[in-house]
């Protein structure tokens, strides 16, 4: 089991992505957005993106 900390869990990774502005309609970088929208983390990003 991984140690608890930033990036250790999908939510921690999402928090880091949000802080960087990834997946946000207001501050997302167009070139980075397609990268974050792949895989499981991308599903979290897409889910929360609709609620921001």
From Swiss-Prot:
Keywords, comma-separated and alphabetical: Plasmid
Source domain of life: Bacteria
The protein, known as: Uncharacterized 5.5 kDa protein in replication origin region
């Amino acid at each position: 089991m991984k140690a608890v900390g930033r990036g250790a869990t999908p939510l921690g990774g999402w928090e880091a992505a949000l802080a960087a502005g990834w997946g946000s309609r207001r501050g997302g970088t167009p070139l980075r957005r397609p990268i974050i929208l792949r895989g499981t983390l991308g599903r979290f990003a897409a889910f929360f993106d609709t609620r921001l």
